[in-house]
């Protein structure tokens, strides 16, 4: 399966409206769906946040110029929320998956499908 198919499948669930897969270092976009693109400083703060969430804790995270309040940050997952919409960022061995969900979707529903994709990729050494 191509990387594009993974982001398209996330959108196809109806639980996510935008998704992007970056290299683990955040220096290359491998696939994007729904028009999600991040500025270099935005992906940079997310990639750094997996190892040291202090910056995200004090400043939030930014996706397409929008500030999201940090809900969770550890070495695998970063969750953020802005009003009723949110983002789920998950790091695997070789990728960073970032997905945005709209106000009509519950956070837990979006989180579950993104984390499941990450589990699959980790299981196949990605």
From Swiss-Prot:
Q: State the compartments where it is located.
A: Cytoplasm, Cytoskeleton
Looking at the keywords, is Cytoplasm present? yes
Tell me the domain of life: Eukaryota
What is the first-listed, main subcellular location in coarse terms? cytoplasm
GO biological process: what's one of them? Answer: intracellular transport
Q: What keywords sit in the KW lines?
A: Actin-binding, Cytoplasm, Cytoskeleton
What molecular function terms (GO) are annotated for this protein? actin monomer binding; phosphatidylinositol-4,5-bisphosphate binding; proline-rich region binding; protein sequestering activity
The Gene Ontology CC terms held by the record are: cell cortex; cytoskeleton; cytosol
Is the Glycoprotein keyword given for this protein?
Answer: no
SMART domains given in the database record? PROF
Q: What is this protein's function per UniProt? A: Binds to actin and affects the structure of the cytoskeleton. At high concentrations, profilin prevents the polymerization of actin, whereas it enhances it at low concentrations. By binding to PIP2, it inhibits the formation of IP3 and DG.
The subunit field of the Swiss-Prot or TrEMBL record says: Occurs in many kinds of cells as a complex with monomeric actin in a 1:1 ratio.
Which family is this protein grouped under? Answer: Belongs to the profilin family.
Q: Which PANTHER family match?
A: PROFILIN
User: Per its record, how is this protein called by name?
Assistant: Profilin
Species this protein is from: Saccharomyces cerevisiae (strain ATCC 204508 / S288c) (Baker's yeast)
Q: Which gene encodes it?
A: PFY1
